[in-house]
Amino acid sequence: MSDTDFDTALVASAFRVAAEQGWHKVNAVKAARAAELSVAEARARFPAIASILLKFGRMADQAALHHVPSEGTVRDRLFDLLMQRFDFLQAHRAGVLALLRALPGDPLTAMLLTCSTRRSMRWMLQAAGVDATGPRGDVQTHGLLAVWLWAVRAWERDKSDDLSSTMAAVDSGLQRAESIASWLDGSRPAPPAAKA
């Protein structure tokens, strides 16, 4: 078994364990045993639960970036990339939902995920053709992170087969982010001042 296959199998097993027992019951040993993988290899490759989470995030990014759209507007490309990332999450839905339920009581994991997801959003921006570097890139990255987190809330409640509610949330979030960015750039007039 290649390293990639091992990692994929262990991470998938970890999220199955989360779905069955809750996120706080997940560890690399339990995931390895459930998938009949080497515990020694699991220790070498996943020394902490954070390693599993970070690997899962990279796998989600790779799934999104595997088919980078080359046509359409930046907004169109970002929509496709984010939805491809949601397709990956959907394949592990029960485990991801277990993780999300655990976050309010686990601020360190929540912080880790926020930082990791912010890096992921920078990748999505750059893949869509946005120069997300420097202070402006930081603002754009935080903006896309806000869109993603907004859409995750919709995805949590979305029971449709085609993720229609999630798609609507991504689309409306990107539209709002685009409007704010245009206003900040001065390419759109500021909203009219309220009359006294």
Language-model regions, residue ranges each:
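Short, Lys/Arg-enriched anionic-surface-contact patches
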Residues: 1-10
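Solvent-exposed, amphipathic alpha-helical segments
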Residues: 9, 13-21, 63-67, 99, ...
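Amphipathic alpha-helical packing segments from all-alpha helical-bundle domains
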Residues: 107-130, 138-150, 168
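C-terminal peripheral helix-coil segments that are non-catalytic and often amphipathic
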Residues: 126, 157-196
